[in-house]
């Protein structure tokens, strides 16, 4: 009795199918790469499960992928004898996209084919790529260890629905038949298929086979009889684990194709490192830095990590124990000789071998990035534009490598006059003034706010470089990166400016004299502002602006307050220190005011101006506007 059911595709699948058919038409042949990749993964999974249950092989342990074509019928079939799927598995895997953040992914699509094709490639189209060339797809599958009459038939024309039925299938594994569109019949040509397999599948460790027709008995050139040969399945790829081959034998093209196989990205990697480690631990790693950030890089639920193999046997995807979170963009694999074949995620968590390997792999990636930064600054900037903000998590997460990570960071600076983050901390150190002991920086809400901050006035006048930080993560970074190569990082908006030897004796004396002369004014402003400020001081950092606000040492900065508020965290009240510039005409005029009410209004106006300049917002903007209008009106009379 038939058990056929019709199911509707998940909404996102419909969207993906439509977009894929229209966006990936220039790279149609990737359907074969994706389907062969999936078939090879199914073989890897069976090999892993059979470690504890040999019966799953059902007497056939020679794992392989077979590809055949029928020109007359216009079909291509990809068949594997891997792990196979149950009915529930078919409905789940071939009817939905089981990825977190899928809705967000679709929001990122622009409708522009070239941009969308890049995003779709990063998303990983997998099985659905079949519909790029097929008007109908038929899947016959039986899960390893299940009875022949528990096999499943899945069919769809890629529109809105698919059918599922129960069938009988003698052999385990999955067979996918593509019924090609009329305009895609070129893919039913065996030579075309062979060229694609050679291009995309040489690195796959499972044999990929195509049928080689036999030949009849025939006469040779000298009249001798050449015996008939039987047809056979011919292996079309090298079928050895690429990472176990000698580096000198592997071409750049093979490395790039392997990257696409394991990452399901279809843009080239930026760089890679293939390394064999011998000693206390023996393992091979092949690590890739992608050229583009994945669309869901900031999604907390996103799986990341390396593929783990033990003695060439695939164990698991996304083994995040080998890679710190701030390097979560790294793709690749690790093949260990020391871990047990029955290793689990729990065992990996607290394993001394894992920890040693993680340390080694982290150093390897940092070394790759250091070499890239030294050898190819332009390419490093490309990396930084994609992954720089993630790398900034490093100093907080990885104390042991904090200095190395800091050396890889890039910032905008007053030296370049550009918003582009191209300045390293070593660049900064090389340009420090004689007698300078600190690395000066400012964190603001935008590059413009940082570059135009009044806190930079004296430093600009003296030609002292300041790093300009304006990313959300910068305040977090700077809380964990307090020094670099024995030079303290010092905020120009916090506490005293502390120029040390950069300020000569005459300047210090003049500053002290000005502060002494302005003491009565400072006291009047303190009285006028009352509890709204922590303190009032004469500034040592302003030259052209009447006043500014400064965060006290040990107090939370305005940027950190915003981060905490955005995360829904309670924030303590922080009162600023108000610094005035007595040399500015507005402040000297303020000093002459005898009307205490007007004095208080002007003092408040200067304070709120300074707060607006520092934070970009005010707690009560309406009160500020009202005060502004009142002052303007008074001066227009």
UniProtKB/Swiss-Prot annotation:
Gene3D superfamilies membership: 3.30.230.80, 3.40.50.11260, Heat shock protein 90, C-terminal domain, Histidine kinase-like ATPase, C-terminal domain
Entry GO terms, CC: cytoplasm
Entry-linked InterPro entries: HATPase_C_sf (IPR036890), Heat_shock_protein_90_CS (IPR019805), HSP90_C (IPR037196), Hsp90_fam (IPR001404), Hsp90_N (IPR020575), Ribosomal_Su5_D2-typ_SF (IPR020568)
Keywords carried by this UniProt record: ATP-binding, Chaperone, Cytoplasm, Nucleotide-binding, Stress response
Record's subcellular location: Cytoplasm
Region (B): 346-562
Keyword Plastid: no
GO molecular function: ATP binding; ATP hydrolysis activity; ATP-dependent protein folding chaperone; unfolded protein binding
Region (C): 563-637
Cited Pfam families: HATPase_c_3, HSP90
Region span, A: 1-345
Family membership noted in the UniProt record: Belongs to the heat shock protein 90 family.
Matching HAMAP family: HSP90 (MF_00505)
Stated role: Molecular chaperone. Has ATPase activity.
Known partners and oligomeric status: Homodimer.
Name of this chain's protein: Chaperone protein HtpG
Organism of provenance: Shewanella sp. (strain MR-4)
Protein's gene: htpG
């Amino acid at each position: 009795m038939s058990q056929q059911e019709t199911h509707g595709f998940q909404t996102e699948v419909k969207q993906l199918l439509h977009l894929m058919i229209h966006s990936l038409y220039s790279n149609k042949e990737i359907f074969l790469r994706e389907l062969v990749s999936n078939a090879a993964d199914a073989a890897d999974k069976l090999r892993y499960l059979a470690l504890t249950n040999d019966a799953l092989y059902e007497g056939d342990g020679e794992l392989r992928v077979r590809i055949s074509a029928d020109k007359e019928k216009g079909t291509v079939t990809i068949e594997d004898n891997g792990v196979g799927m149950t009915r529930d598995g078919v409905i789940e895997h071939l009817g939905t996209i089981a990825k977190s953040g899928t809705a967000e992914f679709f929001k990122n699509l622009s409708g522009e084919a070239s941009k969308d094709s890049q995003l779709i490639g990063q998303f990983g189209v997998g099985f659905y790529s079949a519909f790029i060339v097929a008007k109908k797809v038929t899947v016959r599958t039986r899960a390893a260890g299940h009875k022949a009459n528990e096999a499943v038939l899945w069919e769809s024309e890629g529109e809105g629905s698919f059918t599922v039925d129960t069938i009988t299938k003698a052999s385990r594994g999955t067979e996918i038949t593509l019924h090609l569109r009329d305009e895609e019949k070129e893919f039913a040509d065996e030579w075309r298929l062979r060229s694609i397999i050679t291009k995309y599948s040489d690195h796959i460790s499972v044999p990929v086979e195509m049928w080689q027709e036999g030949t009849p008995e025939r006469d040779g050139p000298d009249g001798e009889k050449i015996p008939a040969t039987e047809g056979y399945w011919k292996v079309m790829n090298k079928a050895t684990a690429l990472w176990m081959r000698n580096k000198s034998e592997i071409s750049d093209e093979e490395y790039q194709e392997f990257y696409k196989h394991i990452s399901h990205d279809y843009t080239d990697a930026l760089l890679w490192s293939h390394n064999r480690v011998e000693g206390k631990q023996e393992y091979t790693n092949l690590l890739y830095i992608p050229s583009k950030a994945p669309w869901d890089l900031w999604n907390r639920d996103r799986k990341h990590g390396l593929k783990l193999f033990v003695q060439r046997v695939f164990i698991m995807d996304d083994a995040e124990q080998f890679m710190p979170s701030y390097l979560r963009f790294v793709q690749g694999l690790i093949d260990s000789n020391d871990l047990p074949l029955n290793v689990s995620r729990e065992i990996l968590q607290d394993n001394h071998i894992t920890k040693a390997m993680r340390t080694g792999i982290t150093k390897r990636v940092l070394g790759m990035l250091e070499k890239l930064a030294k050898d190819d600054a332009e390419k490093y900037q490309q990396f930084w534009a994609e992954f720089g903000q993630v790398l900034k998590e490093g100093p907080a997460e990885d104390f042991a490598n904090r200095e190395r990570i800091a050396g890889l960071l890039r910032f905008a600076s007053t030296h370049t006059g550009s918003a582009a983050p191209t300045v390293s901390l070593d660049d900064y150190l090389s340009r420090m003034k004689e007698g300078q002991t600190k690395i000066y920086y400012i964190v603001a809400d935008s590059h413009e706010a940082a570059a135009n901050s009044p806190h930079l006035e004296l430093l600009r006048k003296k030609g002292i470089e300041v790093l300009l930080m304006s990313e959300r993560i910068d305040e977090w970074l700077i809380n964990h990166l307090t020094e670099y190569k024995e030079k303290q990082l010092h905020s120009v908006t916090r506490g005293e400016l502390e120029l040390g030897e950069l300020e000569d004796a005459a300047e210090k004396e003049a500053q002290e004299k000005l502060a002494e002369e302005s003491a009565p004014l400072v006291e009047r402003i303190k009285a006028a502002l009352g509890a709204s400020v922590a303190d009032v001081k004469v500034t040592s950092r302003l030259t052209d602006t009447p006043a500014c606000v400064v965060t006290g040492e040990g107090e939370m900065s305005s940027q950190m307050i915003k981060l905490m508020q955005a995360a829904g965290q309670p924030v303590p009240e922080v009162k600023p220190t108000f610094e005035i510039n007595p040399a500015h005409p507005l402040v000297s005029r303020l000093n002459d005011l005898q009307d205490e009410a007007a004095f208080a209004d002007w003092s408040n106006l200067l304070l709120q101006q300074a707060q607006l300049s520092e934070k970009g917002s005010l707690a009560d903007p309406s009160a500020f506007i009202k005060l502004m209008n009142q002052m303007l009106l008074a001066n227009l009379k």
